[in-house]
A protein has these predicted regions:
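N-terminal hydrophobic/helix-forming segments and targeting peptides
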Residues: 1-204
Length: 204
């Protein structure tokens, strides 16, 4: 993979963008598209639209979405634990013990998801599927006041972001759905930029 393309993919995957909180990653896309597009605009919904050869009568659009599943902080209890509401579809069973990041105005705050300890669960509780309201985020706060000094109700939360390469030229990262599709759309525009084509090419 070319260096510029790889750096763009990394930037997308390492930039948080839960649904409703996509502005930061949209800035990444605008900057990248601006290098090769004839024009880059943003519509009222926040869609970033980059175009080459806009005067052509035939138009072709390649689209991807930049948001990812996440959470939003809705409550801080007396112990300083954070409770959240889902943004998108999560399986709570897969969340226990996950490293998370709360994206605050002052910067990222590291957290881990916890629940009632296994040795404290009765037999019936052990058989039940975990629910989101039974899970909390521990940021290491001493109490509610300590947590509230860094976290605000409404702050978005994601899995700890990052990128790991695996065997056979594969990789994993939170948010690959659909940031890889977004990357394909704008990388296609970049690669087509120095080639002759008869249509107006839009990456959205």
């Amino acid at each position: 993979m070319e260096v510029a393309a790889h750096e763009f993919l990394m930037a997308l995957l390492e930039t948080p963008s839960p649904s409703g909180y996509e502005q930061t990653v949209q800035e990444v896309v605008r900057e990248y598209a601006g290098r090769v597009a004839d024009e880059v605009t943003t519509d009222v919904h926040g869609n970033v639209i980059a175009c080459r050869n806009s005067a052509a009568p035939l138009r072709l659009m390649i689209a991807g979405h930049c948001d990812q599943i996440g959470m939003v902080v809705i409550h801080i209890d007396d112990n300083g634990f954070l409770y959240t509401q889902m943004i998108g579809g999560w399986d709570p069973q897969q969340l226990i013990g996950q490293r998370m990041t709360v994206w605050t105005r002052e910067g990222p705050v590291h957290a881990v998801i916890a629940r009632k300890s296994i040795h404290l669960l009765n037999e019936q509780e052990r058989k039940q599927v975990a629910k989101l309201e039974e899970l909390w985020l521990d940021i290491g706060a001493k109490d509610k006041a300590d947590a509230a000094r860094v976290v605000t109700i409404g702050d978005p939360v994601t899995l700890e972001l990052g990128y790991r390469e695996m065997r056979n030229n594969l990789a994993n990262s939170p948010g690959m759905d659909d940031k890889v599709g977004l990357w394909v759309a704008f990388e296609a525009l970049r690669r087509a930029a120095d080639k002759p084509f008869k249509c107006a090419l839009y990456a959205v």
